[in-house]
Amino acid sequence: SKNMNKEFNMILENVTGINSKSKISKVAAEKEGSKKGKFRLFVPPSHEDFVGLLYNFMGKGKEGNKHMAFFEKALIRPLNRAYRELNTMQQSIARDFKTLNKQFPDVKSKLNKKIEGLEFTYEDAVRVYLWSKHKHKIPGLSTKEINALSSVVKNDQELKAYANTLKTISKQKTYVAPGESWTAGDIRTDLDDATSKIGRAKVFAEFQKNVDVIFSEENLNKIEAAFGKSFKEALKDNLYRTKTGRNRPTGQNALVNRFTNYINGSVGAVMFINMRSAILQQMSIVNFLNFGDNNVFTAAARFADQPQYWSDWAMIFNSDMVKERRGGIKTDVNGAELAASLKGAKNTPRAIVAKLLELGFLPTQIGDNIAIATGGASFYRNRVNTYLKQGLSQKAAEKKAFTDFQAVTESTQQSARPDMVSQQQASSLGKIVLAFQNVTSQFNRIGKKAFLDIKNRRISPGSSSQIQSDVSNVSRITYYLAAQNLIFYSLQTALFAMMFDDEPDDEKILKKTKYMIHSSIDSVLRGSGVFGAVVSVLKNTVVKYNEQREKAYNPDESAVLGELLNIAVPVGIKSRKITNAEKTLNYNKSVIEEMETFDIDNPIWSARTSQIEAVTNVPVNRMYNKVRNVRDALNNDYTTLQRALLALGWSRYNLGIEDTKVKEVKEKIKESKKQEKKKTKKDNKKKSFKKKTFRKRGF
């Protein structure tokens, strides 16, 4: 540890000029740091991930490569190993718990039932029995109550066997101790605590030991003096969240937590059974390609070896890491908190809605897993071959290759891993302003790291020479900061489909092209942090304001306000749903009255379900649109491509398909009004003629 501390101080001296043997007091660090770290706008320290923060300690050229190797060995690899072991532990406990419940079906069925004569359930009794057995203090319970609940378990041999086995599968010396709010939890939360708290501390021991040496208080003072207070705070925040495994700030009151959950629910409603998102996830397959051992040609060669490729694919898909990603919402910060809020939740309406929204993430999770296995299989096998050539044994090569695969996956896919989440994203403000920006933030960081490696003439991890590193980094910058966004939005808006129409609508194509370009710019801006999000909103507000000012007829001022509300993405979503619902009701008033109430195409259903979804987060509008999509996908009047895209989640609006039934009703109403007008005109003529005749006859 002394050598590690000495080496880090030498690195600081090389990068910052601060003498490696000197010490800086807290006050001196604060005074010196107050002048540093300002005007970092593109991915500032508060929006960096852990590795991005480490990049500040890396010098230029060969020295920079040595610095990178130091952090790789001391921090990055131990961290990735710790997460792999944690995933294995969590999956092992989950499997054992599932097996336990199968072995004791009668016990499982009565766990939530109340014990006769007591205000407690059998599940409470099991937990209290184990806590009492291991001499844990149980907050809020009297000795009499503890003895009564323990006796229930002791006098029921099956329940006792269940409880004792439960302690074994928790893989701890004693059953996890209760907290002050233990009544809000259950056996599942106890097992989660066994891994996320106690178990986490064990598997992260090596990483944490190195962190304590490298980022000691003395060294943090030097860091503050060199990089500023905001940098030091961002680093400490990231290290704390990595240690605890929690992204939500601690100490928030119940109302703040409830509001945050409500906002997260808005994100969940958008992602509910989002098939289009699952399909677009497959774009990330190319994230595993590089200019080294998994280039286009070697990846193709691995795919050509079909038996080995599918064996690796299945191994990855069924690995503990990938199972963890689909076992909870581990791909999105807001989604992960939504899932966390369910732990120990009772069957209240709020808990039921949250559970529904969590289940709605499943298609996206499966899409994410398929993309990882499909792109990762060739990467993994090529990396195994690389390590075998370097002299590693088969087992060592496979283990090291999987750790590399895990690192690439977590850094290029969406991830809610605390070290991959910035201080901004983890804050209450970030949950609202940076919602849906998990992956764009990752991409911006990749692009920034690539630029810094080129600028400082460093060889990036995975490259064997400077030229290979430079080519790879130019490719990363081009793809992650430009091409990926353009491709994504052209697919999301179905712009590609419109270009293949027999009679392409140039005006619609131009409109979608503008949207694609603006959205791509917004992705880079929002992915750079809160400041970029503000710039994005102001840009879009000015554009929308000018659009409405240029309209000669019926300008929509609410659209300008709507753009401003997009600073808080979930609030903007709710605002659009309510505004669009009101517009639908106003513009289609006569159509709604003319059509049958229970006609699925009646605009009233689109409007009302949007209003309900906006207010309650219950994804009724998503369900309504899914039903229509399935019906339209079976409609032979549409082209094969249109039907396929409708089935995969693209809307009629995305594909430029008009709602013919509503259009026909509008035409019918228009014709009816025209005929009514003619009739009125004719009647008026008759009345006028009669009046003239009466006057001529002297009446």
Functional labels for PLM-detected ranges:
Residues 1, 77, 84, 95-98, ...:
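Basic, mixed-charge low-complexity alpha-helical segments
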Residues 21-25, 29-33, 87, 91-112, ...:
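Flexible coil/linker segments and helix-coil junctions enriched in charged and small residues
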Residues 433, 440-447, 475-495, 517-541, ...:
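Membrane-active amphipathic alpha-helices enriched in small hydrophobic residues
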Residues 191, 195-198, 204-521, 548-555, ...:
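Hydrophobic, often aromatic-rich secondary-structure segments at membrane interfaces
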Residues 1-205, 260-265:
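Noncatalytic N-terminal accessory/assembly modules of large enzymes
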Residues 15-16, 58, 226, 316-322, ...:
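Short, aromatic- and cysteine-enriched interfacial helices/patches
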Residues 507-519, 544-570, 574, 581-582, ...:
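Membrane-proximal bilayer-interacting regions
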Residues 28, 44-46, 50, 71, ...:
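Hydrophobic alpha-helical segments
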